[in-house]
A protein has these predicted regions:
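Short amphipathic alpha-helix adjacent to the substrate-entry channel of hydrolases
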Residues: 15-33
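Acidic beta-to-alpha connecting loop that harbors the catalytic carboxylate
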Residues: 79, 113, 156-158, 187-189
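Conserved alpha/beta-hydrolase "acid-adjacent" motif
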Residues: 159-168
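Short beta-strand/loop motif that positions the catalytic acidic residue
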Residues: 146, 152-154, 158
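The serine-hydrolase catalytic nucleophile loop
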Residues: 10-20, 164-165
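Primarily recognizes the serine-hydrolase "nucleophile elbow" in alpha/beta-hydrolase
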Residues: 53-122, 135
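Short beta-strand element of the alpha/beta-hydrolase
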Residues: 1-7
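C-terminal catalytic histidine-bearing segment of alpha/beta-hydrolase fold enzymes
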Residues: 167, 175-224
Length: 224
């Protein structure tokens, strides 16, 4: 699994999310948490391009182990879920890496802003400055056909990224014939949903159960 952390595309580093890697490793999965460049060093779409490079690195290193058919899943929280979703629905990011959405077994998004307009809000406007077509940054507007299966998790009490992002994105994926499971956790907000992945918070909601069930269901996808 390649996990992309959140932070409004402005902050974060992989060290702060080691608890996620440890928790998912304890479930039996190999987890890679790459860093990516952030604003103000870069603007969109540079961080998505960095993420595509990270996935290419993962594939190259899987090949070195002699197990090139090992399934690869993308996952992310908040801004990281936005990045993972774009990689899965917009093939252009992978083209220079000789990969495509078909190389992924599935995508797990936690509290992702899949449908929002980044130019509407002062907090994100500069991150996406220079964007001629705002739909280019919306995963929900980049769905062109069949994508990998999606597991979309969201807290019903999320006051940072409204759960409507997940509901609307899921609907649009389904309209294009994609496999989607969406789960709203009534007891969770924007940050508790990622905390619920790890101890001692993993008993507040069955987030890990949903992740494990999804991976086990789709890990035999035959991706190479």
């Amino acid at each position: 699994m390649v996990f992309f952390y959140g932070g409004s595309w402005k902050s974060g580093n992989r060290g702060k999310y080691r608890f996620v890697g440890d928790a998912l490793t304890n479930l039996g999965y190999t987890v890679v948490i790459p860093d990516y460049r952030l604003y103000p060093e870069v603007r969109f779409p540079a961080f998505v391009e960095d993420a595509a490079l990270a996935v290419r690195w993962v594939y190259d290193n899987i090949a070195k182990t002699g197990n090139s058919t090992r399934p690869v899943f993308l996952a992310g929280h908040s801004a990281g879920a936005h990045i993972a979703a774009l990689l899965a629905v917009d093939a252009s990011y992978f083209q220079s890496q000789s990969l495509g959405p078909q190389n992924l077994c599935g995508v797990i998004g936690l509290a992702g802003p899949y449908t929002f307009d980044p130019l509407r809000y002062p907090s994100t406007r500069k991150v996406f400055e220079g964007l001629n077509d705002r739909d280019y940054a919306r995963p929900s507007a980049r769905i062109t056909g069949v994508s990998p299966p999606f597991l979309l998790l969201h807290g019903a009490h999320d006051s940072t990224v409204n759960a409507a992002n997940t509901l609307d994105f899921a609907r649009k994926l389904e309209e294009k014939g994609n496999t989607v499971k969406k789960v709203l956790f009534p007891e969770l907000g924007h940050y508790r949903i990622i905390l619920a992945v790890a101890r001692p918070f993993d008993d507040i909601a069955p987030v890990n159960n949903e992740i494990s069930d999804f991976i086990e269901q789709h890990r035999g996808c035959g991706t190479s």
